[in-house]
Swiss-Prot record:
UniProt membrane topology term: Multi-pass membrane protein
Family: Belongs to the peroxisomal membrane protein PXMP2/4 family.
The organism of origin for this protein: Caenorhabditis elegans
Single GO MF descriptor: channel activity
InterPro entries: Mpv17_PMP22 (IPR007248)
Annotated compartments: Mitochondrion inner membrane
Name this protein carries in UniProt: Mitochondrial inner membrane protein Mpv17
Amino acid sequence: MVIILFIRRRLATNPLSTQMCIAGTISGSGDCLAQYLSHNQEWDRWRTARFSFLSSCFMAPSLFIWFRLLEKVKGNNKSLLLVKKLCIDQLCFSPCFNAAILFNLRLLQHQSAEKSWDLLKEDWFNIYATSLKVWPFVQVVNLCFVPLNYRVILNQVVAFFWNCYLSYITQKPIDHIEQFY
């Protein structure tokens, strides 16, 4: 209970930094679970660090800004407004966001921009298609019931499982990844 009160206070006073910390923690935990489920012999702490860094320094700030921009979309009919926001989110933001995540993740794996682009082209469609089976439902709940400062957190809670999937898909063996130690 003390942790929840602390988080609520932090969200009220410093929403972005709080969401960044929570996102990095949840994302790193999701990667740890993905590594465990894939029976990795040894925990790859740098892989977990990459996921945590990307989530806290790119994903959380992007979502923080995105949800505030999405709030500016207005309409008289609540149902139509929800559909409008959902379409903007899933058809405009989500494809670009997924592409940026995949590209940046590969760069953090020390891939060249060219190799990162090639891998993005290889993985993007399947990941985006799968995301359409998950995220529209999450966003309906988010947009209808969740206060603005908590939306990134709800996304990150669901992203715990989504990141397990992303981690599994994007961590397939790649020719010559240099380990960053």
